[in-house]
């Protein structure tokens, strides 16, 4: 017999959303630094992604 699922609490939703945002931010930082290091033209600088503050996180 089918049973309705319990509703996910707002705090759980917020925690999961923040984890997802954090993962995407660090992947953006990593890809930006990789693109910066692999740039073949010396004079051209790649545009920074939106929301990028320039501070790199310690690994």
UniProtKB/Swiss-Prot annotation:
Annotated GO CC locations: chloroplast; large ribosomal subunit
Stretch list, region Disordered: 37-59
InterPro entries per UniProt: Ribosomal_bL32, Ribosomal_bL32_plant/cyanobact, Ribosomal_zn-bd
Any one GO biological process: translation
Keyword field: Chloroplast, Plastid, Ribonucleoprotein, Ribosomal protein
GO molecular function: structural constituent of ribosome
Localization per record: Plastid, Chloroplast
Domain of life: Eukaryota
Transmembrane segments: none
Family matches, as SUPFAM superfamilies: Zn-binding ribosomal proteins
PANTHER family found in the cross-reference section: 50S RIBOSOMAL PROTEIN L32, CHLOROPLASTIC, LARGE RIBOSOMAL SUBUNIT PROTEIN BL32C
Family stated for the protein in its record: Belongs to the bacterial ribosomal protein bL32 family.
Name of the protein in its database record: Large ribosomal subunit protein bL32c
Gene that produces this protein: rpl32
